[in-house]
Amino acid sequence: MSKILISGYYGFANAGDEAMLTAIIESLRQVEENVELTVLSGNPEDTAAKHQVRSVYRFNPWAVIQAMYASELILSGGGSLLQDVTSKRSLLYYLSIIGLGKFFGKKVMLFAQGIGPIRAKWARKLTSFVCNKADLITVRDRESASELKEMGVAAAKITVTADSVLSLKPVTGEGGRTLLQKAGV
C-alpha cells in the first residue's frame, strides 16, 4: 500500500481547492484503491470527514514532519500554489514542504500546478532551486511550463497536463437540483 502526503490550500472552505483535492483523491484511488492518503489542511477534521482521508493541521510543524516521514511520496497539488502575488509567505510554505520532503529522502511530485507569477528575484531563484529537486513536475498549462523553464528548472522534469478538476465527473441533473434545493436556490 502506497503512502502519499498531499499538500495544497485545503481546509479553508475554498470550493475550487476542495474540488481539486477531490479530483486528486479520486485519481489516486483509481490507480490504487487502498492507497493511504494524508492531507495537510487548515481544518483537518473537516478535510478528513469530507474526503475520507487522514488529515493533519498544516501549521503544526511536528505533525507535518511526522506525516512526511511516514509517507513515501509528497504530492504538492493543484492550484496556483507557487506564486508571490498574494503572499510571499505562502510561497515559502509550499517550497518548504517540497524541500523538506527531499531532505527526508521522499519522492516529491508537483501535481497539475499553475506556476506564477513569481516576481521577486530571490523568490524566482529559490523556486528554481527547490523545483529542480522535485522528482516530477506536472503543470496545467504551457505558460506555467515556460515560467519554470525561464527560472531555470530543468525542462526534462516538466510535463504539461490538465487541471486536476477536469477529471471530475459532472453532477447529474437530479443531483444538481438536489444541491440547489439544499442551498435554498
Where are the regions that the model predicts?
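Active-site anion-handling motifs in enzyme catalytic cores
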Residues: 1-185
